[in-house]
Amino acid sequence: HGFPTFAVSIAVEHKGRLEHAVIYDPMRQEFFTASRGDGAQLEGRKIRVSSQRTLEGSLIGTGLPFRMDPGLVDSYLAMLKVIMGTAAGVRRPGSAALDLAYVAAGRLDGFWEFGLQPWDTAAGVLLIQEAGGRVGTPTGADYSLGQNIVAGNPKVYEELLAALGPLTPAALRA
C-alpha cells in the first residue's frame, strides 16, 4: 500500500533476558538502541519516557489486532472507547515496534495492543525499560515475549492498567 510506517526491529536475548535492542525507522532515518544497564538512545543521545502524570493528558498508541477473533472485537472497541474518552489522543500508526520506540523516547506516553508476536515487541520492551518506563500484561503481570502488552511511563502505565484491566476478557489476559 505504500504506507510509510515500518521499521527494522532486532533484539538479542541471552538466557531468557533481553540484552540489546535496535529499532531503525528507514523513512525518518532514526536509529533507536538500548543495552541492558546502559539506558536507551536515539541517534546516540539518551532518551527517557515522558513525564506526563495522567492518562487524561496523554497521547496513547495502539494497534488493531491482526485477525482478531470476531468475538473479541467488542471488548477491544470498549477499551478503545474508554481510552479515547480519557486520553488527550490515540494514535494507530501501524508499527508496534515504532510505537514502543516512541514510548521510550517520550513521543507517546503509553501503548497497548493484543496479538503481537515476539519480533514486534522484543526490542521495544528493552528500549522502554532502559528509558525508565514500565511494560506488562493487561492484568499487570510481568511481560513475557508473545503476550498482550501494556507499556508507558510509570504513571500512565498504572492508569492504563486500571482502565484496561477490568475490560480485558479472559481470552486476552495472557
What do the predicted segments below correspond to?
Residues 132-148, 153:
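Acidic, metal-binding active-site segment of PIN/NYN-like and related structure-specific nucleases
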Residues 21, 40, 124, 131-133:
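Small-residue (primarily alanine) positions within well-ordered alpha-helices
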Residues 9-100, 147-174:
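Acidic beta-strand-loop-alpha-helix segment within the catalytic core
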Residues 105-110, 133-134:
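Alpha-to-beta junction loops
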Residues 101-104, 125-130:
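Hydrophobic residues within well-ordered alpha-helices
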Residues 1-8:
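Glycine/serine-rich anion-binding loops at beta->alpha junctions
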Residues 113:
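Short beta-strand and adjacent tight-turn residues that come in two discontinuous sequence segments
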Residues 119:
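Acidic donor-binding loop at a coil-to-helix junction in glycosyltransferase catalytic cores
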